[in-house]
């Protein structure tokens, strides 16, 4: 499968790095998209190569989506093309994994009403206001959406996402 990550500078390092390598380990092709090509750097200094700009992404070419957290989603959600990519993939039922602040992009896409999910507690009210039944649990699976709260939930998050991809 081809899996797309949408992110930007100040991502939460382990929330991007762990799933990136975990999914590659499963044999998937993994791509990172951001505002421009080059590298993006996490909150703790880890840098990753950007494969595509948001404008270069054709969501029809990807099978699943990962939205890591940190401060990056606050920036990504302001990019109309990135939000449209997330909206299209989510509404088409493609597997989508979010953690921490990652759901902010889906909130901006307007696709979460009536869904069950979790996130970093700091955006709990935003999730509830978007129509999510917010659950304080390490991982919540609702159809094509797998959500988790923070780095302490990484193993459960990827365990459930990998199951969904099979």
Swiss-Prot record:
UniProt key word Magnesium: no
First-level EC class: hydrolase
Subcellular location, principal: cytoplasm
Record-listed E.C. numbers: 3.5.1.124, 3.4.22.-
Annotated GO CC locations: cytoplasm
Residue span, PfpI endopeptidase domain: 1-166
One GO MF term: protein deglycase activity
pH dependence: Optimum pH is 6.3 for proteolytic activity with AAF-MCA as substrate.
Localization (cell): Cytoplasm
InterPro entries, sorted: C56_PfpI-like (IPR006286), Class_I_gatase-like (IPR029062), DJ-1/PfpI (IPR002818), Peptidase_C56_Deglycase (IPR053435)
Biotechnology: Being able to prevent acrylamide formation at 100 degrees Celsius, this enzyme could constitute a viable and unique enzymatic method to reduce acrylamide formation in food, whose presence is a worldwide concern because it is carcinogenic, reprotoxic and neurotoxic. The use of deglycases is not likely to affect the quality parameters of foods, in contrast with methods which lead to depletion of the components (asparagine and sugars) responsible for acrylamide formation. Moreover, deglycases can be used directly during the thermal process, which avoids a time consuming pre-incubation step.
Listed CDD domains: GATase1_PfpI_like (cd03134)
Active site: 100 (nucleophile), 101
Temperature-related behavior of activity: Optimum temperature is 84-97 degrees Celsius for proteolytic activity. Thermostable. Displays a half-life of 19 minutes at 95 degrees Celsius.
Keywords noted in UniProt: Cytoplasm, Hydrolase, Protease
GO terms (BP aspect): proteolysis
Substrates-to-products reaction catalysed: N(omega)-(1-hydroxy-2-oxopropyl)-L-arginyl-[protein] + H2O = lactate + L-arginyl-[protein] + H(+); N(6)-(1-hydroxy-2-oxopropyl)-L-lysyl-[protein] + H2O = lactate + L-lysyl-[protein] + H(+); S-(1-hydroxy-2-oxopropyl)-L-cysteinyl-[protein] + H2O = lactate + L-cysteinyl-[protein] + H(+); N(omega)-(1-hydroxy-2-oxoethyl)-L-arginyl-[protein] + H2O = L-arginyl-[protein] + glycolate + H(+)
Similarity field: Belongs to the peptidase C56 family.
Task performed by this protein: Deglycase that catalyzes the deglycation of the Maillard adducts formed between amino groups of proteins and reactive carbonyl groups of glyoxals. Thus, functions as a protein deglycase that repairs methylglyoxal- and glyoxal-glycated proteins, and releases repaired proteins and lactate or glycolate, respectively. Deglycates cysteine, arginine and lysine residues in proteins, and thus reactivates these proteins by reversing glycation by glyoxals. Thus, was shown to afford full protection against glycation of thioredoxin by glyoxal.
Record note on quaternary structure: Homooligomer. Exists in two functional species: the predominant form is a homohexamer that comprises about 90% of the total activity, and the minor form is trimeric.
Name assigned to this protein: Deglycase PfpI
């Amino acid at each position: 499968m081809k899996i797309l990550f949408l992110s930007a500078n100040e991502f939460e390092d382990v929330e991007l790095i762990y799933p990136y390598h975990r999914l590659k380990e499963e044999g998937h092709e993994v791509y990172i998209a951001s505002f421009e090509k080059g590298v993006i750097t996490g909150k703790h200094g880890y840098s990753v190569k950007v494969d595509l700009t948001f404008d270069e992404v054709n969501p029809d070419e990807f099978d699943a989506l990962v939205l890591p957290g940190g401060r990056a989603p606050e920036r990504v959600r302001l990019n109309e093309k990135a939000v449209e990519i997330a909206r299209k993939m989510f509404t088409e039922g493609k597997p989508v994994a979010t953690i921490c602040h990652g759901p902010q992009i889906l909130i901006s896409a307007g696709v979460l009403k009536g869904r069950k999910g979790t996130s970093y507690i700091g955006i709990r009210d935003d999730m509830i206001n978007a129509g999510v039944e917010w659950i304080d649990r390490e991982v919540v699976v609702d159809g094509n959406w797998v959500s988790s709260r923070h780095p302490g939930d990484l193993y459960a998050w990827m365990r459930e996402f990998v199951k969904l991809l099979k």
